[in-house]
Amino acid sequence: MRGLYLITNDDPIQLLLEKLDVALATGQIAILQYRRKKIAKIDQPSEVEQIKALCEKHQVPFVINDDLALAEQFGLGVHLGQSDGEISHAAARLPKGVIIGRTCLNSLELAKKAIADGATYVAFGAVYATSTKPEAGNVGIEVIKQAKQKFAVPICAIGGLTVENSQVVIEAGASLCAVISDILGRSTAEIPARVTAWATLFD
């Protein structure tokens, strides 16, 4: 599990689907996460169904942010924040073998617990300041270096990551770089080249 971890943005769904299709078609997206905080709960299942079809078409693992019930409805993996319930509970409700990730902020102790509970990967951030979560602060790369030395599961970095600033993050030990705006903040035409630029960082 290594490479670009793409997270959805708040574009209108048709535009988002177009962007996701060209991004996933590159064959260089490691995981896609559904995160649509501004979309009403009642509208989310139909969006997930459409995006799930794209992920199946391009053979990209698909996970749901925060919402275990939604993940369970579609038999998908889930990414859980610290306040989104226990990993063991998620593992009991989801199909065997799906991805279960955990936000660990800047804490190796939280990561240790998550891994003991069965997390597939652990995420640290925000590495850099970010408009998506301005309250998250920036943890820098030292915690990623330490996590890489301590843990066998993939380390995911998140927060303000771009092609230009992420080489050091990957060299520090991040197997996954979670990104929203550096891909989906661009036009559909620009996305494939940007995804490819990311992929070269992981070579």
Predicted features along the sequence, with ranges:
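Glycine/Thr-rich beta-alpha phosphate-binding loop at enzyme active sites
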Residues: 73-75, 80, 102-149, 186-188, ...
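Catalytic cores of alpha/beta
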Residues: 62-77, 90, 106-120, 150, ...
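Glycine-rich phosphate-binding active-site loops on the catalytic face of alpha/beta enzymes
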Residues: 6, 82-90, 123-135, 166, ...
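Alpha-helix-loop-beta-strand connector modules within alpha/beta enzyme cores
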Residues: 47-66, 88-107, 137-163, 198-203
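Short secondary-structure boundary segments
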Residues: 10, 36, 82, 104-106, ...
